[in-house]
Amino acid sequence: MAHITFDTKNIENFVADHELDEMQPLIKMADEQLRNRSGAGAEYSDWITLPTDYDKDEFARIQTAAQKIQSDSKVLVVIGIGGSYLGAKMAVDFLNPMFNNELADNQRQGVKIYFAGNSTSASYINDLVRVIGDQDFSVNVISKSGTTTEPSIAFRVFKQLLEKKYGAEAAKQRIYATTDANRGALHDEAKISGYETFTIPDGVGGRFSVLTAVGLLPIAASGADIEALMTGARDAQEEYSDSDIKNNEAYKYAAVRRILYDKGYTTELLINWEPTMQYLSEWWKQLMGESEGKNQKGIYPSSANFSTDLHSLGQYIQEGRRDLFETVVKLDNPVSNIDLPHEDGNNDGLQYLEGVTIDEVNTKASQGVTLAHVDGGVPNLAVHLPAQDAYSLGYLIYFFEIAVGASGYTFGINPFNQPGVEAYKTAMFALLGKPGYEEQTKVYRARLGK
């Protein structure tokens, strides 16, 4: 039995049983392309068996490195962007208290985790340098090539900060490079400088890399249980190995999404009801958007954080265009709970909630919102998590990964490349005057009137 539950009771008015039956041949074909490595982009599909086939020796080194970081640092600065950032950020937030970095050292499981290299904002970098201040820190720089603009800029800044604080040689012992095993600028620098290195596997694309060293080192340094994370993913790998939709809820999710898309529901909102899950949505958006958005096809991935966004997006969801559907990730058992405090009088009108916990309010709110949105014509799917722990997160990660792999093949596209991102990079490099872009520089500067 699956550890997480996929609930489709609120799409009965939108998707008929026979439509799911009719999707089965397409899902079976997609499954064969995934399992047999015969589909487009198959060279980047090693994530399918990663929970069982990962490098156990490197995993042990990750655990040792995390312990070293915890012993000599108060802060770990994780430098990366896209898949080299979102997976780790998502998991660190999900598996730790909301204000983890603000807790006293004896109340935290691991070090404070801050992220850099995920934007070109000078203010962000400067503010982070000020936050670190005199605290001991280490750096985990994550880049397959070592030449991605945003991480490379941040790495220069924090590497020099380390060297200024500890000296050039001691600084090298505080830099952990997660990069290509054999080539690239970061690989070469790490080899020359003697940084401890971890591998980004060739067969695992960035958005699928959270269960590699890309995600595991920051997650472990935060104090979370990466063994339980991998166990959850391993059990999900086994659970979602059947090509039959009736026996595979991840494939059922993929099938339902495709049916809704064909009916004009082209935007999917991932909904959470816990602030610590905000970056689950950000990670999911990259996973879905980069995998499916090709050849003028694909479901547009968006998200909302409830109940907060009900006070901004609630009106549109309820009565706006009927081209969206919701997938709610609902935590069934909160990490902690609070009873609503007693107060004499009833000035705030909350006396009727006397004896109710705040999570009960959260649950009833989510149920009420779902009913209202379904009544308003919004198909509503739900993924129920029994607990907010590492095992459940590993399970959920694999659920979404295998679902989007199959979903991509049902669209007839390559789910594992992202050719479209080169367009903006070409324009950016040309405007910055990067060598090799001289002709494009003339064109783009002329378009800007410069």
Swiss-Prot record:
Gene: pgi
Gene Ontology CC entries for this record: cytosol
Pathway(s) annotated for this protein in UniProt: Carbohydrate biosynthesis; gluconeogenesis; Carbohydrate degradation; glycolysis; D-glyceraldehyde 3-phosphate and glycerone phosphate from D-glucose: step 2/4
One Pfam family this sequence matches: PGI
Family named by the database record: Belongs to the GPI family.
Organism lineage: Bacteria, Bacillati, Bacillota, Bacilli, Lactobacillales
Cross-referenced NCBIfam families: PRK14097.1
UniProt-recorded name of the protein: Glucose-6-phosphate isomerase
InterPro entries, alphabetized: G6P_Isomerase, Phosphoglucose_isomerase_CS, SIS_dom_sf, SIS_PGI_1, SIS_PGI_2
GO molecular function: carbohydrate derivative binding; glucose-6-phosphate isomerase activity; monosaccharide binding
Keywords, alphabetical: Cytoplasm, Gluconeogenesis, Glycolysis, Isomerase
Enzyme Commission number, as recorded: 5.3.1.9
